[in-house]
Design a protein with these regions (language model features):
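Alpha-helical membrane-protein topology signature
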Residues: 1-232
């Protein structure tokens, strides 16, 4: 029996984690877009998150196809299909409600046009890698906007901690995989993603503790007040 190499272990582990993250991300997006059957105002960073994810997956899909990387190709293919269907169907319903057909038309054209151009001109090692890295780094923009809102509002519930921890683990696995196969294009975005995700998890922990201590303090004050009233 042939021993399984480390790059295959971390490659498939990273791919499986990424696919699971795609599913959880879409589930979170659906719950955010719909509350008891009614549409609500969606923050800008949540509107563009899955669009950026689509561009990331489609660019990595072409890159992995050209360079014959089965681990990247499998998760990128599933991610591209998931986010494409999400944008076409869910955004179609949402933008119909707010009458933004021009915006929707732009999104649909971008979904078809950008991957076509990337495939038409083809990838080379010097061009394809930086394009994927650029899309990947841009996709962290919604996370930074969300983190900014968390810091301003001190509302730790904006951070989905389970999804955050999954992303943290996935970034770590992809980093190790990229390090093993010596691919800087995989290493760079996952180092940046790991840092942003770790900072988000840290703020979630900090603000949750502060919220818990404030609730405990308010409860103590209320108990003391009730005791004083009872004594009087």
């Amino acid at each position: 029996m042939m021993p399984v190499s480390a790059d295959k272990i971390f490659g498939w582990l990273s791919a499986c984690l990424s696919i699971f993250i795609f599913i959880v991300s879409i589930k979170v997006s659906i719950s955010s877009f719909r509350v008891k059957g009614k549409y609500k105002t969606i923050p800008f960073y949540m509107r563009i998150e899955n669009i950026l994810n689509y561009f990331v997956c489609s660019s990595w899909l072409i890159y992995s196809y050209i360079f014959n990387n089965i681990h990247l190709f499998s998760c990128s293919l599933i991610g591209t299909i998931f986010f494409f269907l999400w944008i076409i169907f869910i955004y179609l319903i949402y933008f119909r409600k707010i009458s933004c057909f021009k915006y929707l038309t732009f999104i649909i054209l971008a979904l078809i046009y950008i991957p076509f151009i990337l495939f038409l001109f083809g990838f080379s090692w010097s061009i394809g890698g930086p394009i994927c890295v650029t899309f990947n780094i841009i996709s962290f923009f919604p996370s930074i906007l969300m983190l900014k809102e968390v810091i301003i509002t001190k509302n730790y519930r904006l951070i989905k901690i389970k999804l955050n921890l999954l992303k943290l683990l996935a970034h770590l696995c992809w980093f190790i995989y990229g390090f093993i196969i010596i691919n800087i294009n995989i290493v760079i975005p996952n180092v940046i993603g790991f840092i942003i995700t770790f900072v988000s998890a840290s703020f979630w922990n900090i603000f949750k503790k502060k919220s818990g201590s404030e609730k405990l303090s308010n409860r103590s004050v209320e108990v003391m007040r009730n005791r004083t009233e009872y004594t009087i």
